[in-house]
């Protein structure tokens, strides 16, 4: 559900604006995706940093009946899971560009890879690392969700690039 929400938000915002700029020029379309990428990365770093620091204070509010050790586990798991929205956000961004070029199959396949990552977490990571292994499986799934789309995105010629300018 979280993945679908990210995808819907990204595609609702990005696809029409990207296509509008693409009709103007490829350069304008590239500028747009690079600007969106920069805004996304800055926002994510800011939000993740604040959340990471705040988690020990937030955990008792969300799991008030848990003992201290369990609350620490919740904090640890949540901190691991903070990586996942980064990959899923980039994946939603990638899929928006791909869908602009009417490439739908790769996004559909990416959902399978997301689940494969979670299954790997359950089968491989949990026996080795315990419950945090499940969180790492979710992170792996979100990474696979993004990475599977990258080759198709490169072929479009519109792979986003982060360029730092003065």
Question: Where in this protein do the model-derived segments appear?
Answer:
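Membrane-embedded alpha-helical bundles of multi-pass transporters/translocases
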Residues: 1-166
